[in-house]
């Protein structure tokens, strides 16, 4: 195993252990993506700067979940994005929710973590985590942020369709709406 692959896997495993200790058990999905060379280089730079991975919140209020739709896309997801250097995954999720949707959320747990292996034929695999938190609405008016390429923010009482990521199909809907 290449040193970079080993180090990124070990760091991801540490994050899994730390989040399980803080939030309790959650699902882990092992995923594999094939980025182009430029995207891989950006991911590698973020890993080297301790800013690798990302986070989001599946934010609920009463009987609804908050989702965003990005420009040039028709699919929906919870707000979330890339982690910044020195930021915890929870801080990333809360910041991205404010930036993308204009609302505040309170994290209540972890739904799942995606351990994503970025694989190319020219570089060693890089394993990075994306933490998906469960959260409750804490305030603010939903407002799309064009600076983050968010075209629309909306509360859904039924699972939105289409979903940006297949994994969202298993996320809990408030009051049991599946």
Please report, for each region that a protein language model flagged, where it lies by residue.
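Short, well-ordered beta-strand micro-motif
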Residues: 59, 132-136, 154-157
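A short coil-to-beta-strand element that immediately follows conserved catalytic motifs
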Residues: 104-113
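A carboxyl-terminal module marker
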Residues: 1-4, 178
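Conserved Nudix-box catalytic region and its N-terminal flanking loop in Nudix hydrolases
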Residues: 60-99
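Acidic, metal-coordinating catalytic segment for phosphate/diphosphate chemistry
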Residues: 6-56
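Active-site-adjacent beta-strand/loop module that shapes the phosphate/pyrophosphate-binding cleft
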Residues: 115-142
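NUDIX/MutT-family hydrolases
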Residues: 144-175
């Amino acid at each position: 195993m290449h040193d970079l692959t080993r180090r990124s896997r070990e760091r991801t495993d540490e994050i899994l252990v730390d989040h399980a200790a803080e939030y309790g058990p959650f699902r882990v999905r092992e995923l594999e993506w094939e980025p182009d060379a430029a995207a891989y280089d950006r991911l590698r730079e973020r890993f080297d700067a301790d800013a690798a991975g990302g986070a989001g919140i599946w934010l609920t209020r009463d009987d609804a979940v908050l989702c965003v739709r990005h420009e040039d896309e028709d699919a929906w997801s919870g707000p979330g994005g890339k982690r910044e250097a020195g930021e915890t995954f929870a801080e990333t999720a809360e910041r991205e929710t404010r930036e993308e949707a204009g609302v505040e959320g309170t994290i209540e747990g972890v739904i799942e973590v995606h351990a994503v292996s970025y694989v190319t034929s020219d570089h060693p695999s890089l394993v990075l985590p994306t933490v998906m938190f469960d959260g409750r609405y804490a305030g603010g008016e939903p407002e799309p942020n064009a600076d983050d390429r968010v075209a629309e923010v909306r509360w859904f009482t039924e699972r939105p369709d289409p979903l940006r990521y297949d994994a969202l199909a298993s996320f809990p809907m408030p009051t049991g709406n599946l």
